[in-house]
């Protein structure tokens, strides 16, 4: 299939004669992670025909236009490529959101909430979006019909006591009833762990 969206890793820079810093090595595309924070941010390239179809930037999301576009693109294509190389240098200055510890543009983080909320509505998910624990992150409180089954996946290799503590804690403390515990066995060798599995 033809690629419709490319994004790259990035770092930050103050001036051309200063060293670059704070590299951001991004993961490959993850819609769930994207909904939690705009980890893609810069540098993004979109296929023109797709952008024409989507209508480009929308002023409703001023400060988070890139986030809105990335979410809309993700709704319309699976042909997304991450190039794991630093190909973008984000210039840091006092009025830039490049300074992660600043409130230089709080409206940018506020605009992320309706961008995600509208995305959820477009894809048919019910939930409420709020700010996460860290600046620039978001939490979605999904609304479910009924009590869907939750799979708790625990990888393990020869860790009987740790695994037992984990499983016992789930069994004792969980107030949710419709769940399963899946233990992913990773080449354990001790008899003790296989006895515990029984």
Predicted regions and their residues:
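A recurrent flexible, glycine/aromatic-enriched loop bordering the glycosyltransferase active site
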Residues: 13, 19-50, 61-62
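Donor nucleotide-sugar recognition loop
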Residues: 55-71, 107
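Short hydrophobic beta-strand elements that form part
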Residues: 153-154, 183
């Amino acid at each position: 299939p033809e690629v419709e969206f490319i994004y790259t890793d990035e770092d930050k820079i103050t001036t051309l004669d200063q060293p670059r810093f704070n590299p951001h090595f991004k993961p490959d595309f993850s819609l769930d992670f994207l909904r939690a924070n705009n980890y893609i941010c810069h540098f993004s390239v979109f296929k023109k025909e797709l952008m024409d179809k989507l209508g480009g930037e929308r002023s409703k999301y001023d400060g988070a236009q890139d986030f809105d576009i990335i979410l809309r693109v993700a709704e319309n294509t699976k042909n997304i490529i991450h190039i794991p190389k630093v190909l973008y240098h984000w210039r840091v200055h006092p009025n830039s959101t490049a300074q992660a510890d600043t409130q230089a543009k709080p409206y940018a983080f506020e605009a992320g909430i309706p961008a995600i909320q509208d995305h959820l509505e477009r894809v048919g998910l019910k939930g409420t979006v709020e700010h996460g624990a860290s600046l620039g992150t978001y939490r979605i409180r999904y609304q479910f019909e009924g009590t869907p089954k939750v799979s708790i996946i625990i990888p393990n290799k020869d860790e009987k006591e740790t695994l037992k503590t984990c499983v016992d804690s789930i069994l004792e403390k969980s107030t949710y009833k419709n769940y399963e515990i899946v233990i992913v066995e990773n080449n354990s060798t001790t008899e003790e762990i296989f006895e515990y599995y029984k």
